[in-house]
C-alpha cells in the first residue's frame, strides 16, 4: 500500500462540490471512480479543502492509498487518461509517508476570488468569474479588508450550514487589487468557515460600490450575526489556490 499526495486542478462548474453528494456529481467521486477503473480498488481521496458547488481549484491537495504498484508518473498518466474529458487534471503527484494527511497536516490554505468589473456580459469567463457591472473602488475595498485581518468571531461571514465547532478564526491575509478590468481578492488562513471567503468578498463589493463604508464592514463583523451580512458573492469567481504543509 502506497500513499500518494496529489495536486489537482479543476473547473467546478459541472460539480456539486468536492465532497461526494447523494444528489449530484462531485470532484471526489470523479477521481475515485477514475482510480477504480485502472486499479479495481475502492479508494477514498481526501482533500485539504472541500469546495462548494461551482467553486474551482488551481492546486487542490489530496491524498489516496493505492495497493497496485505504481510510480507517481504512472499514476498521474493513468488517472488523467481516465478522467478525460472531465475538467479535472492531476498536475502533481508524489509518494508521502503513510501518516501524511492532506487535511489534518495542512497548516495554511489560500483562496483567490476573481471579479470582472465591466458592463459587457462575460463570454469566455462565464462561470469562472463574477461579473460586476458598476465600477469598484479597489483602494477602498483593500483598506476596509484590513479590518478583517487577525483573530475574530466570523459568525457574520459563515453559512448557517457551517459545521465548524467555533466561528473564531485567524485571517492571515486579505488583499484586493486591480489588474485591468479584473479585481482579484486573495485570502489566506490556517482554515476557513463555510462561505467565509464568498461572504467577505460580497461585503467588500458593497464597500467598492460606496454602499458600505469601512465602518459598516467593521460593524457587520462585530455584530457576529449572519443577518448583518451585506451580500454573499456567487461561487463562480472562487478558486482554491494552495495548501501549506510543514
Swiss-Prot record:
Subunit structure of this chain's protein: Homodimer.
GO BP annotation list: tRNA pseudouridine synthesis
Residues given in the record as substrate binding sites: 111
Reaction(s) catalysed by this chain's protein: uridine(38/39/40) in tRNA = pseudouridine(38/39/40) in tRNA
Name this polypeptide is given: tRNA pseudouridine synthase A
Domain of life: Bacteria
Active site: 52 (nucleophile)
Listed InterPro entries: PsdUridine_synth_cat_dom_sf, PsdUridine_synth_TruA, PsdUridine_synth_TruA_a/b_dom, PsdUridine_synth_TruA_C, TruA/RsuA/RluB/E/F_N
Keywords: Isomerase, tRNA processing
EC number of the protein: 5.4.99.12
Disulphide bridges, residue numbers: none
Amino acid at each position: 500500500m502506497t500513499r500518494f499526495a496529489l495536486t489537482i486542478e479543476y473547473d467546478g462548474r459541472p460539480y456539486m462540490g468536492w465532497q461526494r453528494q447523494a444528489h449530484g456529481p462531485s470532484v471526489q467521486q470523479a477521481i475515485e471512480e477514475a482510480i477504480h477503473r485502472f486499479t479495481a480498488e475502492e479508494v477514498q481521496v481526501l482533500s485539504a479543502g472541500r469546495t462548494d458547488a461551482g467553486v474551482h481549484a488551481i492546486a487542490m491537495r489530496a491524498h489516496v492509498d493505492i495497493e497496485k504498484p505504481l510510480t507517481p508518473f504512472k499514476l498521474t498518466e493513468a488517472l488523467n487518461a481516465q478522467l478525460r474529458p472531465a475538467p479535472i487534471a492531476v498536475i502533481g503527484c508524489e509518494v508521502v509517508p503513510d501518516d501524511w494527511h492532506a487535511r489534518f497536516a495542512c497548516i495554511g490554505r489560500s483562496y483567490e476570488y476573481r471579479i470582472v468589473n465591466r458592463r459587457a456580459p462575460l463570454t469566455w469567463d462565464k462561470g469562472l468569474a463574477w461579473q460586476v457591472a458598476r465600477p469598484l473602488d479597489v483602494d477602498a475595498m483593500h483598506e476596509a479588508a484590513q479590518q478583517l485581518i487577525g483573530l475574530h468571531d466570523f459568525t457574520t461571514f459563515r453559512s448557517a450550514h457551517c459545521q465548524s465547532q467555533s466561528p473564531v478564526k485567524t485571517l492571515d491575509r486579505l488583499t484586493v487589487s486591480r489588474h485591468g478590468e479584473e479585481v482579484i481578492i486573495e485570502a489566506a488562513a490556517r482554515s476557513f468557515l463555510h462561505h467565509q471567503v464568498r461572504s467577505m468578498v460580497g461585503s467588500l463589493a458593497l464597500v467598492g460600490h460606496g454602499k458600505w463604508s469601512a465602518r459598516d464592514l467593521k460593524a457587520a463583523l462585530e455584530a457576529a450575526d449572519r443577518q448583518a451580512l451585506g451580500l454573499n458573492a456567487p461561487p463562480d469567481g472562487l478558486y482554491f489556490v494552495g495548501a501549506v504543509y510543514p
